[in-house]
Protein backbone atom coordinates (compact mmCIF):
# COMPACT_ATOMS: atom_id res chain seq x y z
CA UNK A 1 0.00 0.00 0.00
CA UNK A 2 2.77 2.56 0.74
CA UNK A 3 4.10 2.07 -2.80
CA UNK A 4 0.79 3.27 -4.25
CA UNK A 5 0.94 6.52 -2.28
CA UNK A 6 4.54 7.18 -3.25
CA UNK A 7 3.71 7.26 -6.97
CA UNK A 8 1.24 10.20 -6.92
CA UNK A 9 3.29 12.00 -4.27
CA UNK A 10 6.47 11.66 -6.31
CA UNK A 11 4.65 12.84 -9.45
CA UNK A 12 3.30 15.90 -7.63
CA UNK A 13 6.75 16.70 -6.24
CA UNK A 14 8.36 16.34 -9.66
CA UNK A 15 5.70 18.54 -11.28
CA UNK A 16 6.21 21.21 -8.61
CA UNK A 17 9.97 21.22 -9.16
CA UNK A 18 9.55 21.50 -12.93
CA UNK A 19 7.13 24.43 -12.63
CA UNK A 20 9.35 26.19 -10.09
CA UNK A 21 12.43 25.73 -12.30
CA UNK A 22 10.57 27.02 -15.37
CA UNK A 23 9.50 30.13 -13.46
CA UNK A 24 13.08 30.83 -12.41
CA UNK A 25 14.40 30.49 -15.95
CA UNK A 26 11.68 32.40 -17.79
CA UNK A 27 10.72 34.99 -15.18
CA UNK A 28 14.00 36.83 -14.83
CA UNK A 29 16.45 37.15 -17.67
CA UNK A 30 19.93 38.50 -17.31
CA UNK A 31 20.10 42.20 -18.02
CA UNK A 32 21.57 42.88 -21.44
CA UNK A 33 24.54 45.18 -21.98
CA UNK A 34 24.15 48.82 -22.93
CA UNK A 35 21.96 51.61 -21.65
CA UNK A 36 18.50 52.62 -22.81
CA UNK A 37 18.35 55.65 -25.10
CA UNK A 38 16.30 58.68 -24.13
CA UNK A 39 12.84 57.96 -25.54
CA UNK A 40 9.91 60.32 -25.96
CA UNK A 41 7.10 59.59 -23.48
CA UNK A 42 4.36 57.47 -25.04
CA UNK A 43 0.88 58.70 -24.09
CA UNK A 44 -0.64 55.27 -24.86
CA UNK A 45 1.22 53.55 -21.99
CA UNK A 46 1.97 50.53 -24.20
CA UNK A 47 3.65 47.75 -22.20
CA UNK A 48 5.71 45.83 -24.78
CA UNK A 49 8.04 44.27 -22.22
CA UNK A 50 8.84 43.94 -18.52
CA UNK A 51 12.48 42.81 -18.70
CA UNK A 52 15.30 42.53 -21.25
CA UNK A 53 14.65 38.79 -21.58
CA UNK A 54 11.37 39.56 -23.36
CA UNK A 55 13.19 41.49 -26.12
CA UNK A 56 14.76 39.85 -29.18
CA UNK A 57 18.48 39.70 -29.86
CA UNK A 58 20.37 42.56 -28.17
CA UNK A 59 17.33 44.83 -27.70
CA UNK A 60 16.69 46.16 -24.18
CA UNK A 61 13.40 46.77 -22.40
CA UNK A 62 13.35 50.58 -22.01
CA UNK A 63 10.79 52.92 -20.48
CA UNK A 64 9.27 55.98 -22.11
CA UNK A 65 6.99 57.64 -19.60
CA UNK A 66 4.40 55.03 -18.60
CA UNK A 67 5.24 52.79 -21.58
CA UNK A 68 7.95 50.19 -22.14
CA UNK A 69 9.50 49.22 -25.48
CA UNK A 70 12.17 46.88 -26.82
CA UNK A 71 14.80 49.29 -28.08
CA UNK A 72 18.31 49.23 -29.51
CA UNK A 73 20.52 50.23 -26.56
CA UNK A 74 23.21 52.83 -26.39
CA UNK A 75 26.42 51.16 -25.33
CA UNK A 76 28.08 54.15 -23.66
CA UNK A 77 27.27 55.81 -20.35
CA UNK A 78 26.04 59.37 -20.02
CA UNK A 79 23.08 61.20 -21.47
CA UNK A 80 22.71 63.25 -24.60
CA UNK A 81 23.00 67.01 -24.02
CA UNK A 82 19.95 69.24 -24.41
CA UNK A 83 19.76 70.68 -27.92
CA UNK A 84 19.11 74.40 -28.30
CA UNK A 85 16.61 74.47 -31.18
CA UNK A 86 17.21 78.20 -31.64
CA UNK A 87 20.83 77.52 -32.60
CA UNK A 88 21.08 74.24 -34.52
CA UNK A 89 24.59 73.00 -35.21
CA UNK A 90 25.13 74.28 -38.73
CA UNK A 91 26.99 71.97 -41.06
CA UNK A 92 25.94 68.88 -39.09
CA UNK A 93 22.51 68.39 -40.66
CA UNK A 94 23.30 64.85 -41.72
CA UNK A 95 23.43 61.56 -39.87
CA UNK A 96 26.95 60.82 -38.65
CA UNK A 97 26.08 57.68 -36.66
CA UNK A 98 23.34 55.23 -35.77
CA UNK A 99 24.61 53.85 -32.44
CA UNK A 100 27.09 54.96 -29.77
CA UNK A 101 29.70 52.41 -30.84
CA UNK A 102 30.20 54.34 -34.10
CA UNK A 103 31.42 57.38 -32.14
CA UNK A 104 35.03 57.79 -30.94
CA UNK A 105 36.02 57.60 -27.27
CA UNK A 106 33.26 58.54 -24.83
CA UNK A 107 31.20 60.40 -27.44
CA UNK A 108 27.56 59.35 -27.91
CA UNK A 109 25.27 59.26 -30.92
CA UNK A 110 22.63 61.94 -30.15
CA UNK A 111 20.09 64.15 -31.92
CA UNK A 112 21.75 67.36 -33.08
CA UNK A 113 18.85 69.80 -33.43
CA UNK A 114 18.10 69.54 -37.13
CA UNK A 115 16.44 66.14 -37.17
CA UNK A 116 19.66 64.17 -37.57
CA UNK A 117 22.13 62.47 -35.20
CA UNK A 118 25.83 63.09 -34.67
CA UNK A 119 28.63 62.16 -32.25
CA UNK A 120 28.66 64.54 -29.27
CA UNK A 121 30.22 64.75 -25.80
CA UNK A 122 27.66 63.39 -23.31
CA UNK A 123 26.56 64.77 -19.95
CA UNK A 124 27.58 62.67 -16.94
UniProtKB/Swiss-Prot annotation:
Which residues, renumbered to this chain, are glycosylated? 44
Keywords from the named record? Aspartic protease inhibitor, Disease variant, Disulfide bond, Glycoprotein, Protease inhibitor, Repeat, Secreted, Serine protease inhibitor, Signal, Thiol protease inhibitor
Q: Which GO terms describe its biological process?
A: antibacterial humoral response; innate immune response; proteolysis; spermatogenesis
Q: Name one Pfam family in it.
A: WAP
Quick one: effect of changing residue 103 to R?
A: In BENP; likely pathogenic
One Gene Ontology cellular component annotation? extracellular exosome
Tissue expression: Expressed in a number of normal tissues, including male reproductive system, regions of the respiratory tract and nasopharynx. Highly expressed in a number of tumors cells lines, such ovarian, colon, breast, lung and renal cells lines. Initially described as being exclusively transcribed in the epididymis.
Q: Which domain of life is it from?
A: Eukaryota
> Which segments constitute the WAP domain?
31-73, 74-123
Q: Which residues form the signal peptide?
A: 1-30
Principal subcellular localization: secreted
Q: Which residues form each disulfide bond in the chain?
A: 36-62, 45-66, 49-61, 55-70, 80-110, 93-114, 97-109, 103-119
Q: Name one GO molecular function term.
A: cysteine-type endopeptidase inhibitor activity
Compartments it resides in = Secreted
Q: What PANTHER family does the record tag this protein with?
A: WAP FOUR-DISULFIDE CORE DOMAIN PROTEIN 2, WHEY ACDIC PROTEIN WAP
What disorder is listed for this protein? Bronchiectasis and nasal polyposis: An autosomal recessive destructive airway disease characterized by persistent abnormal dilatation of the bronchi, and severe chronic rhinosinusitis with nasal polyposis. Affected individuals suffer from sub-normal lung function, chronic productive cough, excessive sputum production, and recurrent sinopulmonary infections.
State the function annotated in the UniProt record.
Answer: Broad range protease inhibitor.
Q: Subunit structure of this entry? A: Homotrimer; disulfide-linked.
User: What is this protein's record name?
Assistant: WAP four-disulfide core domain protein 2
Amino acid sequence: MPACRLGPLAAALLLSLLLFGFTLVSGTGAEKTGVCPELQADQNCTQECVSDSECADNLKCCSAGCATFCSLPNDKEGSCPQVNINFPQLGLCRDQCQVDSQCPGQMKCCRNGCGKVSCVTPNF
